[in-house]
Regions:
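Gram-negative outer-membrane beta-barrel transporters
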Residues: 545-548, 568-656
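Transmembrane beta-barrel wall of Gram-negative outer-membrane proteins
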Residues: 179-214, 225-272, 293-315, 469
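N-terminal periplasmic accessory domains that precede
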Residues: 62-65, 95-98, 108-109, 125, ...
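Short acidic/polar hinge/loop motifs at secondary-structure boundaries
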Residues: 115-141
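C-terminal beta-signal and adjacent terminal beta-strands/loops
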Residues: 4-5, 651-656, 676-736
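Outer-membrane beta-barrel signature, preferentially recognizing the C-terminal barrel domain
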Residues: 291, 295-299, 352, 418, ...
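Face-selective signature of the C-terminal outer-membrane beta-barrel domain
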Residues: 244, 248-266, 293-454, 458, ...
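Extracytoplasmic beta-strand/coil segments of soluble accessory domains associated
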Residues: 38-40, 63-118
């Protein structure tokens, strides 16, 4: 008997729970439960939530509707459910690349179509669609050749009303508070509607990306005598200004075109104030520094998706995107003297332009009554044009006006163009073996050529065969088991090919690039179970996974001499990872609170790889051992009010980083958040959100060694903590 079959059998009318069963219930959902009558329809492996299901909560947007469905709190931070803050995400090794790769998680579609773009997610679009335009929300747990996505554990399909003419305007105005008493306003306005065969969504957004961090660092020398202390304030005055559009036009009942675009300005200038106290002298010495880090970043994206359905039900689809990201930044470091004068001692200028062009075509047809096949090809071109210039007061080169008049410092691999051309033919077969059992199998053949020119010239060819099998068995309409086997080729970061700014270490200016980096690949095996409790009480799910990795990317020794020790991101060998994810989303009707939705997640995982410096088995770099999340949403419809909490905590003590001369491990305080939301009679929502109710310190311990890490000669031990402070915000949202 499987885990969830055993569990579900204990919930039949008249049954009694044994002590073992009670323990299992406690592990999976921390509480018992009873039925809650709600109006939902179950169509095989698809659960349908009509618009009437959400009436009592008076939602404003489609995102508000989705947040009320057990197991589907995809609202993200600031909209009631909340995803974890930065640094709390889990597995860093998952995910393929290209437009056809499924997320292995939850995909969101609108009217059966996904967004033809990478910088615009369908989940963010839900916050701009009025709830009055939603006909129903479908939770699709099966797989089919008719779906517009592949490989996802489930699909959320938001069906909009078909009206000849309709439109709505949604708006959001917000103010955010930072711990340095800075208040930053922002806002979003969106127009969405339909005119006959034409539908549209236009969005104008201006959001602050302001942050203020206080860093405290203390260090001792290798003989455990005091070394220094560092107090640093880092203020980033970032912004995110966007203009985006999503357009769709149905030429006929069987021919449709979707187009989307995005123009964005994401500048993030940063100022740093730093005071270093030298404890090795008497009296102590003070070094006061200021850093100015101007940053300008602009990007745009266009995407298109055309689909034609033939009379026999076969479909032709053509999809393409093009995007451009221009990121220019500088790092200027000044020493401030007692008379308040300053001297420039470091100037680092980096420019990076990243471009991507992808086109994908496919033809889907029925092979037999219960089988369909999709044949197609994808071609992608990705380029990075990177330039870096370094000037230092202590350099030996000639003064250069381009680096603030400082002596020029030569940096290896500082100016390069990296290009990848990838071609990927594929075949996908969907087979409904019987009403309860489906199998999706795919075979992709990837060929790619990576060339690098400039300071380094290199050209390499790669090819990978990527099969995947996804078997789903609906034991009952509410209980599904899913097993997958797939080979994944992880996307390379082209920034690892070239020299770059080192913003994690004040004692280092640049990171070296590696022109010989290869893709990290993995064979991944997973077993998933999902049990939907009767009468929409909630959802329980579990995933167990194991992965064999090849060419794991981590720090690699490329030193040419013992006096010039250098490490780069490189391929260090093979590794494994394994773990489990347990999820519960329960309505608390058993305690008289049917409108209290509790979501909890427990992730436990581990990994192993051979360390190239010490020759020992250890975890992947900064690999989380696990995490626990708990979020709640309590609706009080008669007051038009809801509130909730957010809690995220990692399993600390296991996140390590081994480098050629350093060793680091990180720990952090749990994240606590709380929100409250009230709606007036006009339908305007007022929301107070506190994303961090405590200090939320994230700490790092770094061991520096004299020479190689393997020599074991400790030079310095640093302990550094970053404090982000309480982060409240106030938001007003409405539609008309």
């Amino acid at each position: 008997m499987t885990l969830f079959a055993y569990f579900s059998s204990s919930l039949q009318p008249g049954s009694r729970l044994s002590y073992a069963q009670r323990a299992m219930v406690a592990v999976l959902c921390v509480m018992p439960f009873t039925a809650l009558a709600q109006d939902t329809a179950d169509d095989g492996s698809t659960v349908i939530y009509p618009a009437e299901y959400f009436t009592e909560w008076q939602p404003i947007t489609a995102q508000d509707m989705l947040a009320r469905i057990p197991g589907q709190d995809a609202s993200g931070p600031g909209r009631g459910g909340g995803g974890p803050p930065g640094g709390f995400t889990g597995n860093p090794t998952r995910g393929g690349r290209g437009l056809g790769a499924g997320s292995s998680g939850t995909e969101i579609m609108i009217n059966g179509k996904r967004t033809a773009g990478k910088n615009q997610s369908a989940s963010s679009l839900l916050g701009r669609i009025a709830a009055s335009q939603v006909q129903e929300i479908q939770i699709i747990r099966g797989t089919s050749g008719e779906l517009d996505v592949r490989g996802s554990s489930q699909v959320i399909n938001v069906i909009l009303l078909e009206e000849l003419s309709s439109s709505s305007i949604s708006y959001e105005a917000a103010v955010n508070y930072a711990q340095d008493d800075t208040i930053n306003p922002g806002g979003t306005v969106a127009l969405n509607g339909q005119r006959g065969s034409f539908d549209y969504l236009l969005t104008l957004r201006s959001q602050p990306r302001y942050s203020n961090e206080l860093n405290n660092e203390s260090s001792i020398l290798g003989d455990f005598s005091p070394n220094d202390t560092v107090i640093e304030e880092r203020t980033r005055d970032g912004e995110n200004n966007e203009l985006s559009f999503n357009l769709g036009y149905a030429f006929t009942d069987n021919s449709r075109l979707q187009v989307n675009g995005l123009f964005a300005q994401r500048d993030a200038p940063t100022d740093v104030e730093r005071v270093t106290t030298d404890l090795r002298t008497n009296p102590v010495g003070l070094l006061v520094e200021r850093e100015a880090l101007p940053n300008e970043r602009d990007n745009w994206e266009f995407g298109g998706d055309y689909e034609y359905t033939f009379a026999n039900g076969a479909r032709f689809k053509l999809l393409g995107i093009a995007n451009h990201d221009d990121n220019a930044s500088q790092r200027q470091r000044f020493q401030r003297f007692a008379d308040n004068s300053e001297e420039l001692n470091l100037f680092l200028d980096t420019k990076a332009i990243t471009e991507e062009r992808i086109v994908r075509g496919s033809y889907t047809f029925d092979l037999f009554e219960s089988q369909s096949v999709e044949l197609g090809m994808e071609r992608a071109q990705t380029t990075l044009d990177s330039k870096l210039q370094l000037g230092s007061l202590f350099g030996t080169g000639a003064p250069n006006p381009a680096v603030g008049g400082l002596p020029n410092v030569r940096v290896s691999n500082a100016n390069s163009v990296v290009e990848e051309i990838r071609v990927e033919p594929f075949a996908i077969h969907n087979w409904r073996i019987n009403p309860q059992l489906t199998l999706e199998s795919s075979l992709l053949y990837e060929t790619s050529e990576i060339t690098q020119s400039g300071d380094v010239s290199n050209q390499r060819d790669f090819d990978f065969i990527k099969p995947k099998f996804d078997l789903r068995y609906d034991i009952t309409p509410t209980f599904q088991v899913r097993g997958t086997i797939e080979r994944i080729v992880n996307q390379l970061s082209f920034a690892d090919f070239v020299a770059a700014n080192d913003d994690q270490d004040n004692d280092s200016n640049t990171l070296a690039g590696n022109a010989n980096l290869r893709q990290q690949t993995q064979w991944r095996y997973s077993l998933n179970s999902e049990y939907r409790l009767p009468n929409d009480v909630g959802v329980l799910s579990a995933e167990f996974f194991y992965a064999d990795h090849e060419d794991v990317i981590d720090w690699l020794d490329v030193s040419t001499s013992e006096t010039n020790l250098v490490s780069v991101n490189g391929n260090i060998g093979d590794g494994v990872e394994y773990g489990a994810n347990l999820n519960a989303s329960i309505r608390m009707g058993m305690i008289g609170l049917p409108n209290l939705l509790v979501n909890s997640t427990l992730n436990v995982q581990d990994s192993e790889v051979m360390d190239p410096f010490l020759g020992i088995e250890r975890r992947f770099r900064f690999y989380q051992r696990g995490r626990f999340t708990l979020t709640t949403r309590h609706d009080i419809p008669q007051w038009r009010f809801n509130w909730g909490i957010q809690y995220f905590d990692r399993i600390d003590g296991g996140m390590f980083m081994y480098d050629l001369q350093d060793f680091e491990w990180t720990v952090g305080d749990p994240f606590h958040g709380v929100f409250a939301e009230i709606r007036d009679r006009r339908g305007i929502t007022y929301r107070l959100d506190v994303r961090q109710t405590s200090d939320g310190a994230q700490c790092r311990e770094r061991w520096r060694f004299d020479g190689r890490l393997s020599d074991g000669i400790l030079e310095e031990l640093e302990y550094r903590c970053t404090h982000g402070g309480v982060q409240p915000s106030f938001t007003v949202t409405g539609t008309f």
